[in-house]
């Protein structure tokens, strides 16, 4: 009955000129917004840390340039100047009332950091197909041994049980 219904449905769709499987729009981009925002955030953080590291190395190699950079960061920014502010700098310069106002942002940032740490501990290893086959064979052999062990144990239990005629 069910098979007949499906056949009638398919033939009816084809008879009308419609394809059996309705055409769906596959042009929709699926984006995991949380993952994208976390990666974007941590890419910015990494760039800031790398920039800071480079500036520190430059200031060690060229002390006069480092003083000039430090002086320029203390002055108010001019139009078009890039400013990189890290969370540590913000914590030192903000008052407690400002921190309370930005508490939700800080909580969000902390959650993002924790999520990134979790993701960074997740590793995906690609295993060659030969290894997969070897592993599968080993696993099948383990299962066979455990089944044969269970069968031996149950056979021993059965042979040691008193039969109904012995009672």
Curated annotation (Swiss-Prot):
GO cellular component, one term: sperm midpiece
Transit peptide: 1-24
Tissue specificity note: Expressed specifically in testis.
Modified residues (Phosphoserine): 26, 129
InterPro entries registered for this protein in UniProt: SPATA19 (IPR028219)
UniProt-annotated location(s): Mitochondrion outer membrane; Mitochondrion; Cell projection, Cilium, Flagellum
Keyword terms, alphabetized: Cell projection, Cilium, Developmental protein, Differentiation, Flagellum, Membrane, Mitochondrion, Mitochondrion outer membrane, Phosphoprotein, Spermatogenesis, Transit peptide
Upper lineage: Eukaryota, Metazoa, Chordata, Craniata, Vertebrata
Gene expressing this chain: SPATA19
Species this chain originates from: Homo sapiens
PANTHER family named among the record's database cross-references: SPERMATOGENESIS-ASSOCIATED PROTEIN 19, MITOCHONDRIAL (PTHR36468:SF1)
Protein name as catalogued: Spermatogenesis-associated protein 19, mitochondrial
GO biological process: cell differentiation; sperm mitochondrion organization; spermatogenesis
Function of the protein: Essential for sperm motility and male fertility. Plays an important role in sperm motility by regulating the organization and function of the mitochondria and is also required for correct sperm midpiece assembly.
Pfam families named among the record's database cross-references: SPATA19
């Amino acid at each position: 009955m069910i098979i007949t219904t499906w056949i009638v449905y398919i033939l009816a769709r084809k008879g009308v000129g419609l394809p059996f499987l309705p055409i769906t729009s596959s042009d929709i981009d699926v984006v995991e917004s949380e993952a994208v925002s976390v990666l974007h955030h941590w890419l910015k953080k990494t760039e800031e840390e790398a920039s800071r590291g480079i500036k520190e190395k430059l200031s060690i190699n060229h002390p006069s340039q480092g003083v000039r950079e430090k002086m320029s960061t203390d002055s108010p920014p001019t139009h078009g100047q890039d400013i990189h502010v890290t969370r540590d700098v913000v914590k030192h310069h903000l008052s407690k009332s400002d921190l309370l106002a930005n508490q939700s942002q800080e909580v969000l940032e902390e959650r993002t950091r924790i999520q990134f740490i979790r993701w960074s501990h997740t590793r995906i290893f690609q295993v060659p197909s030969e290894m997969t086959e070897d592993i599968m064979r080993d696993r099948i052999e383990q299962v066979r041994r455990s089944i044969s062990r269970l069968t031996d144990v149950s056979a021993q239990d059965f042979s040691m049980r008193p039969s109904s005629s012995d009672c």
